[in-house]
UniProtKB/Swiss-Prot annotation:
Name this polypeptide is given: DNA ligase
Source organism superkingdom: Bacteria
Residue span(s) of domain BRCT: 591-668
Enzyme kind, highest EC tier: ligase
One GO MF term: metal ion binding
Binding-site residues, NAD(+): D32, V33, E34, Y35, D36, S81, L82, E111, R134, E171, K290, K314
UniProt keywords, alphabetically: DNA damage, DNA repair, DNA replication, Ligase, Magnesium, Manganese, Metal-binding, NAD, Zinc
C-alpha cells in the first residue's frame, strides 16, 4: 500500500472516531487544535494523492458545486406527521385510547420535540447514499449534498452489525449558538435576519450551493429507523432499543431520550424538559411520546397521516398577538441606541411580556411596523421577546411611524450610524451618562491606566454620589471625599488616592486603550502609539492615514475618526492632560531594532522579576504581537512559574518555549 494511501486511511478513521466521540458521545477526546492539525494534514495528503481519498473522509463535508434546482425523491415509505396533545387532560385521553387496545403493560419512549426540519437519510452497505426532506410525506427534495456537510452525520456507519440498507429519520436543527452567530453576521452586514432557528435550519438545508450549508453549523438528531432491508434483519424489540442501535452505528441520538413506565413519569419528564427548555442548545416546542414496545406499535397501527402509537405533547404557545403601544429608545454601555417596543402585556411561552427589542432602524423598516399595529410576539429562544411580524389587516388609520432619534435621549449628543453598520450609536462617548460608568471602569482597569484598588463597585459609587463625571475627575479626588463611599475609611481612601496619583504616569498606548474607542484593543492601541508617537499627530490624522497602521482596517479607522471628531471626546482628553496624565516620549525605532517584527508571542504563568504588562510592552516595542492564547501561529511562549494549559498546548503544537530568564536576556 502506498504511504500516502495508508496515512489517508489512518487519518480518516482517526478523525471519524473523534467525530463520533464529539457528536454522539458528547465526550471530546482531543483538543480542537489537535483535530484541526490532523484535518489539515489529511487535506494536504488528499491534495497530493486525490485517488486515495475515502468516501467517508471528513473533508467531503466542505460542499460541492451549486445545483440549478432540487430533484424530487419518493420516500421508501411515507414520512408521517404526529397528532398533538396540549395539556395533561388530553394526554390522559391519548393514554386511555392506547391502553384500551393493548392493555396497561406498556411504557413510553420520551424525547424532546426538536423544532427543526425532518429528513430521511439512506445508508447502503453502511455508506451514506442520499438524503431528502420530508416534503409532503410521500416525496421530498434531494438534499444529499447539503446533508453531507453536516459534521455530526456519519458518512459511514460504525461497526459491521448494520443492515445492508438502513434508512435513518431525524431532525436537522440549528443550535442556539450557531443561530445567534449567524444573525449577528447578518445584522453587521445589514442583511435580513432569520426569525428563529427552525427557519434558519430550513433555509440552510435548501441552499442550492452546499458550501453555504457547510458554513451554517447545523446539527442532527435521529428519532427513528425507517426502512430496513432485508426486513428479516434482527432489530431491537423496543423503540428505545432501536435508538440505541442507531447510536452504536455512530448516528447522533439526543441524550434527553428516556423511557417512562407510567403516566406520572411521563408528566415528570414533560415538566422537567419544559423547565430546562431555555438551557438546551436547541429549539424544542414540546416532547414526543412513543409507545416503546414495537409489538404494540404494530398492533396499534396508523390513522391517515399519523401513527396511533405516538403523539406530540406541545408546550404552551411561544407566539401570540398583541398591540404595540409605543417605542422607547435605550442607550447601552457602548452607546448603541436600541428601540424597545412597549407592548400591551401578553402571556406567551409561560411568561407575561410587555417589552420587546426592535434591534435597529433596519429591522423596523424590514417589519414595516408602526405604533398602533397589532404584532406577533415570539419568545425567541425562550429568553428574548421578539417581534416577528405585523398583522397588516388590523392596522388602525392613526398608526404612527417609528422615528429614530437624531439626538441621544440621554445626553443629547448626535446619534450617528457608520456606513456598513446596522446599529446607531450615541456619539457622546464619555460625556454620555448612559456610557459613563462602563467607560470609567474601563479607564481604570488593569490593562488601561491600572488604578490599584479602583474596582467596579468603587466606580459605581463615585458616579452615583456625583463625585466623578469624567475620567479626569478621578485625579481630583481627595481622601476626605472618598470616605463618603461605603466601607471606605481614611486609611483606604488615602491609599486609593495615592494609587490614582501613580496612575498619572502611563504610556501612550495605555492612554489610547483607556479612552475606550470602539474596536481599539490593546494591540491596536500599541500600534497606533508606535505609528503616531504623539497625541497631536493622532488627533490630526484622517481615516485614510489610520488605515496605514498595522491591524487597522476601514471599520476601526472610521471609529477612530468619529471619536476624535466629537468635541466632547476631545474635551475629555484635554482635561486628562490638564490634570497631569502623561507618558514618556516615544523615540524613533530603527527597523533593525524590530528584531521580533512579525512574530506572535504569548505570556503564561507568574513572572517573578518582570511586570507582565511591562514585558508585554517591551515585546511590542520590538515588533512582536502579544496574544492571549496559544495557536499554531504562535512563535514563542514565555512560561513563568506555575504555567498551566497554555504550556501544555504549546508543547503539543511544538511551539518554542522559554523561561523568564531567557526573556530578560532578549529584552536587555
Amino acid at each position: 500500500m502506498h504511504a500516502n494511501e495508508l496515512e489517508i486511511l489512518e487519518l480518516t478513521q482517526q478523525l471519524n472516531l473523534h467525530n463520533y466521540h464529539y457528536y454522539v458521545d458528547d465526550n471530546p477526546t482531543i483538543p480542537d487544535v489537535e483535530y484541526d492539525r490532523l484535518l489539515k494534514r489529511l487535506i494536504e495528503l488528499e491534495t497530493q494523492s486525490p485517488e486515495f481519498a475515502k468516501a467517508d473522509s471528513p473533508t467531503q463535508r466542505v460542499g460541492g458545486e451549486a445545483l440549478a434546482k432540487f430533484e424530487q425523491i419518493t420516500h421508501l415509505k411515507p414520512m408521517l406527521s404526529l397528532d398533538n396533545v396540549f395539556d395533561e387532560t388530553e394526554f390522559n385521553g391519548f393514554h386511555s385510547r392506547i391502553t384500551d387496545k393493548v392493555g396497561t403493560a406498556l411504557s413510553y419512549c420520551c424525547e424532546p420535540k426538536l423544532d427543526g426540519l425532518a429528513v430521511s437519510i439512506v445508508y447502503r452497505d453502511g455508506v451514506f447514499e442520499r438524503a431528502a426532506t420530508r416534503g409532503d410525506g410521500q416525496t421530498g427534495e434531494n438534499i444529499t449534498e447539503n446533508v453531507r456537510t453536516i459534521k455530526s452525520i456519519p458518512l459511514k456507519l460504525r461497526g459491521d452489525n448494520f443492515p445492508p440498507l438502513v434508512e435513518v429519520r431525524g431532525e436537522v436543527i440549528m443550535p442556539h449558538k450557531a443561530f445567534n452567530a449567524l444573525n449577528e453576521r447578518a445584522r453587521a452586514k445589514g442583511e435580513k435576519l432569520f426569525v428563529n432557528p427552525r427557519n434558519a435550519a430550513a433555509g440552510s438545508l435548501r441552499q442550492l450551493d452546499s458550501k453555504i450549508t457547510a458554513s451554517r453549523a447545523l446539527g442532527f438528531y435521529a428519532y427513528a429507523l425507517g426502512v430496513v432491508e432485508p426486513e428479516s434483519w434482527e432489530l431491537a424489540d423496543s423503540h428505545y432499543g432501536q435508538l440505541e442501535q442507531l447510536r452504536s452505528w455512530g448516528v447522533p441520538v439526543s441524550q434527553e431520550v428516556k423511557v417512562c413506565d407510567s403516566v406520572t413519569e411521563v408528566m415528570d419528564y414533560y415538566n422537567d424538559i419544559q423547565q430546562r427548555r431555555s438551557s438546551l442548545d436547541f429549539e424544542i416546542d414540546g416532547v414526543v411520546l412513543k409507545v416503546n414496545q414495537i409489538a404494540h406499535q404494530l398492533s396499534l397501527g396508523f390513522v391517515a397521516k399519523a401513527p396511533r402509537w405516538a403523539t406530540a405533547f406541545k408546550f404552551p404557545a411561544q407566539e401570540e398577538m398583541t398591540l404595540l403601544e409605543g417605542v422607547d429608545f435605550q442607550v447601552g454601555r457602548t452607546g448603541a441606541v436600541t428601540p424597545v417596543a412597549r407592548l400591551k402585556p401578553v402571556f406567551v411561552g409561560g411568561v407575561t411580556v410587555s417589552n420587546a427589542t426592535l434591534h435597529n432602524a433596519d429591522e423596523i423598516a424590514r417589519l414595516g411596523v408602526k405604533v398602533g399595529d397589532t404584532i406577533i410576539i415570539r419568545r425567541a429562544g425562550d429568553v428574548i421577546p421578539q417581534i416577528v411580524a405585523i398583522v397588516a389587516d388590523k392596522r388602525p388609520d392613526d398608526a404612527q411611524d417609528i422615528v429614530f432619534p437624531e439626538r441621544c435621549p440621554v445626553c443629547d449628543s448626535e446619534v450617528e450610524r457608520i456606513e456598513g453598520e446596522a446599529v446607531a450609536r450615541c456619539s457622546g462617548g464619555l460625556f454620555c451618562e448612559a456610557q459613563r460608568k462602563e467607560a470609567i471602569k474601563h479607564f481604570a482597569s488593569r490593562k488601561a491606566l491600572d488604578i490599584d484598588g479602583m474596582g467596579d463597585k468603587v466606580v459605581e459609587q463615585l458616579i452615583d454620589k456625583e463625585l466623578v463625571e469624567s475620567p479626569a475627575d478621578l485625579f481630583k479626588l481627595t481622601a476626605s471625599a472618598m470616605t463618603m463611599l461605603e466601607r471606605m475609611g481614611m486609611k483606604s481612601a488615602t491609599k486609593l488616592v495615592a494609587a490614582i496619583e501613580v496612575a498619572k504616569e502611563t504610556t501612550f498606548a495605555r492612554f489610547l486603550y483607556a479612552l475606550g474607542i470602539r474596536e481599539v484593543g490593546e494591540a491596536t492601541a500599541a500600534n497606533l502609539a508606535a505609528y503616531f508617537k504623539t497625541l497631536d499627530a493622532l488627533k490630526g490624522a484622517s481615516a485614510e492615514e489610520f488605515i496605514k497602521v498595522d491591524d487597522v482596517g476601514a471599520i476601526v479607522a472610521a471609529h477612530l475618526a468619529h471619536f476624535l471628531a466629537q468635541p466632547h471626546n476631545l474635551e475629555v482628553i484635554d482635561k486628562l492632560i490638564a490634570v497631569g496624565v502623561s507618558w514618556p516620549a516615544i523615540e524613533e525605532v530603527a527597523e533593525e531594532d524590530l528584531s521580533l517584527k512579525g512574530q506572535t508571542w504569548v505570556l503564561t504563568g507568574t513572572l517573578t522579576q518582570l511586570n507582565r504588562n511591562d514585558a508585554k510592552a517591551q515585546l511590542q516595542a520590538l515588533g512582536a504581537k502579544v496574544a492571549g492564547s496559544v495557536s499554531k501561529n504562535t512563535d514563542c511562549l514565555v512560561a513563568g512559574a506555575a504555567a498551566g494549559s497554555k504550556l501544555t498546548k504549546a508543547q503539543e503544537l511544538g511551539v518554542k518555549v522559554i523561561d523568564e530568564e531567557a526573556l530578560i536576556a532578549i529584552l536587555s
